[in-house]
A protein has these predicted regions:
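A short SAM/SAH-binding and catalytic strip from SAM-dependent methyltransferases
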Residues: 135-147
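Conserved alpha-helix/loop element of class I SAM-dependent methyltransferases that forms part
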Residues: 30-49, 60-64
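A short acidic, Gly/Pro-enriched loop at the edge of an enzyme's catalytic core
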Residues: 125-136
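Conserved Class I S-adenosyl-L-methionine
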Residues: 212-303
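Conserved catalytic/acceptor-binding region of the Class I
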Residues: 161-223, 230-245
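Class I SAM-dependent methyltransferase SAM/SAH-binding core
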Residues: 50-127
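N-terminal, positively charged/glycine-rich alpha-helical extensions of SAM-dependent methyltransferases
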Residues: 1-25, 31-35, 301-303
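A short glycine-rich, Lys/Arg-flanked "PGG" loop and its adjoining helix->strand segment in the class I
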Residues: 150-162
Length: 303
């Protein structure tokens, strides 16, 4: 069972709504991990008809998945309506079409292969999709924005068709530890072994988890703080409310400056967790066999 999160879902939506225009200039790590995930995907044989990009942001990953699988329908889902609209506009979609119009196109009479992804503002933990309809669930570095990982995986399992591949990346527990050491709060990052257990509990099979560590550097405290804010900021319930003064900001910049190395750059540790698992396919019965259904009622049937 996953632990309760300190994330405020309303704050998550507001943070990303405010940062829609700033994300594109600060998403270098998202794009790099996306590239590495796509390399891993090359090793897997799948021919998905419906792909869900959970936590799609500005939709770059959705577009690359559409290019990889041109016959598939790709649905980019983000909890922020302004973010989903910006993704649609960025990639030439009509940003103002309603979610129901989009889903009607997806499950209606349209021919397979949508040419471009559909972008929908929705909760990835409550997908606007029927059960057993998705062939590939993809999520790139959005895990720490989901408030209940166990419930999230159960929802993805509900939507997954038999044989569906789940592929995702997440920040590991050692990410940004230098910030925590100087008293700067960070989101809660889950241990990959816990994630593996949650996958099994949710009903996924053959989970594979691994991690890699890297160091990311910034040229100044101001640049580091700006990019971290652009990537989502602080959305925990325990965050301070109201406006922070100039002295608070300067104190934070001074603490960050203390992390600088001899070259003046600030280095932070990042642990990237990769995971994939499968929704078990329903096994066909051997020839000549048929299912037997038992009536558990108390009455006796007629002979």
């Amino acid at each position: 069972m996953s632990e309760a999160s300190d994330l405020d879902p309303k704050a998550v939506r507001l943070q990303f709504a405010r940062r829609t225009q700033r994300l594109a200039g600060a998403d270098f790590l998202l794009r790099e991990i996306e590239r590495r995930m796509l390399e891993r995907l090359e090793l897997v044989r799948v021919q998905p008809a419906l792909i869900v990009d959970a936590g799609c942001g500005l939709g770059q990953g959705s577009v690359l998945l559409q290019q990889r699988y041109p016959a598939a329908n790709v649905l980019g889902i983000d909890v922020s309506a302004p973010m989903a609209a910006a993704a649609a506009a960025l990639h030439g979609m009509q940003a103002r079409r309603s979610m129901f119009d989009r889903l009607r196109q997806l499950f209606g009479a349209a021919q397979p292969g949508a040419q471009a992804p559909l972008f929908v503002a929705a909760d990835a933990a409550s997908l606007p999709l029927p059960a057993a309809s998705v062939d590939l669930v993809w999520s790139n570095l959005a895990w720490h924005w989901f408030t209940d990982p166990g419930a999230l995986l159960q929802e993805w399992r509900r939507a997954a068709r038999g044989g569906c591949l789940l592929m995702f990346s997440a920040f590991g527990v050692d990410s940004l530890r230098e910030l925590r050491d100087i008293g700067v709060s960070t989101p809660r990052f889950d241990d990959m072994h816990d994630i593996g257990d949650w996958l099994v509990t949710a009903g996924f099979a053959e989970p594979v988890m691994d991690a890699e560590r890297m160091t990311v550097t910034w040229e100044s405290p101001q640049r580091l703080l700006s990019e971290l804010h652009a990537l989502g900021g602080n959305a925990v319930r325990s965050r301070g409310k109201g406006m922070r003064g100039r002295h608070f900001l300067q104190s934070r910049l001074d603490r960050l400056a203390g992390l600088a190395g001899p070259d003046g750059r600030i280095a932070l540790s990042v642990e990237i967790v990769y995971g994939h698992a499968w929704a078990p396919a329903q096994r066909p019965l051997p020839p000549g066999f048929s299912p037997v259904h038992f009536d558990r009622g108390g009455g006796r049937g007629k002979p």
